[in-house]
């Protein structure tokens, strides 16, 4: 994260971090052993990525000897991409065999009835928190597709978390041929999604963004 260091925010963060170290030094000076205090030595940090390369995921899959549950240890949560989201795909089969939370990307090509079958395969017990539906329609299509998807999920009583991915449906090419996204399009799709979900008695549970501090046109 070297690009952060030269920014005003980076300097502000460094100042705060140094102050925290000073406070910890003071605590140790008065006799408190900070190494024995768990919350001073660790942080909850969660990761997620697409379960795309199955040989990689399989090599990092483990079964817990105590609970007997099987986990993909490459990430806390993995998701199935829009192009690998079909009932008989190897990716759906893999995700049905692990106990991690699973995301499912939902684009305009989605068949809602097939999605119900996929959810049943991955989450047969309809466990809350297991499935996140990450919809990626674009600002001009979210009103067309999202209401019907919500209706299908509600009709079948599926417990899901709704997550907006305003990145992939709003990709455009600049005059120079570079792929990019207009930030206003991201805001528009997300705002529209919040309204649609609210009208259907649901709420937005998260947003999927691709971010970087570097000069990358595809991210924001």
Positions of PLM-derived features:
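Extended C-terminal subregions enriched in glycine
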Residues: 135-214
């Amino acid at each position: 994260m070297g690009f952060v260091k030269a920014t005003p925010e980076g300097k502000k963060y460094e100042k705060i971090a140094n102050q925290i170290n000073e406070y910890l030094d003071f605590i140790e000076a008065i006799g408190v052993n900070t190494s024995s205090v768990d919350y001073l030595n660790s942080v909850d940090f969660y990761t997620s990525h697409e379960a795309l390369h199955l040989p990689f995921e399989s090599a990092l899959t483990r079964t817990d000897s105590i609970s007997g549950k099987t986990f993909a240890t490459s990430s806390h949560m993995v998701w199935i991409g829009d192009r690998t989201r079909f009932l008989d795909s190897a990716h759906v089969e893999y995700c049905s065999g692990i106990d991690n939370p699973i995301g499912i990307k939902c684009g305009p090509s989605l068949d809602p009835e097939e999605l119900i079958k996929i959810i049943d395969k991955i989450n047969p017990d309809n466990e809350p928190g297991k499935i996140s539906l990450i919809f990626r329609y674009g600002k001009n299509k979210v009103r067309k597709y999202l209401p019907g998807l919500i209706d299908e999920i509600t009709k079948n009583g599926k417990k899901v978390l709704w997550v907006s991915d305003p990145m992939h449906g709003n990709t455009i090419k600049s005059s120079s041929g570079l792929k990019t996204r207009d930030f206003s399009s991201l805001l528009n799709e997300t705002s529209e999604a919040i309204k649609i979900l609210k009208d259907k008695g649901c709420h937005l549970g998260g947003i999927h963004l691709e971010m970087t501090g570097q000069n990358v046109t595809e991210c924001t």
